[in-house]
């Protein structure tokens, strides 16, 4: 399966934190994805871009914080995270290129 431009619109960037590093030991990778994407789109995009088989996709939406800048109230953007569990024997190394 080749990666189309639409697949790159779904996956924004990989998230590398202490929690995601621990999840990667269990075969899961965490990505920030487009807020309007759904689980089948995320699964298709990861399989096309990275050439792996996806077992499951779990998503969360984190609401943006209210912040103050020069006395004005503003809101940060909402962020959608996708926890992608890979099939046995498949790996994605997101730390390359850092």
Curated annotation (Swiss-Prot):
Keywords: Ribonucleoprotein, Ribosomal protein, RNA-binding, rRNA-binding. One of the early assembly proteins it binds 23S rRNA. One of the proteins that surrounds the polypeptide exit tunnel on the outside of the ribosome. Forms the main docking site for trigger factor binding to the ribosome. Belongs to the universal ribosomal protein uL23 family. Part of the 50S ribosomal subunit. Contacts protein L29, and trigger factor when it is bound to the ribosome. GO terms for biological process: translation. GO terms for molecular function: rRNA binding; structural constituent of ribosome. It comes from Jannaschia sp. (strain CCS1). SUPFAM superfamilies: Ribosomal proteins S24e, L23 and L15e. GO terms for cellular component: ribonucleoprotein complex; ribosome. This is Large ribosomal subunit protein uL23.
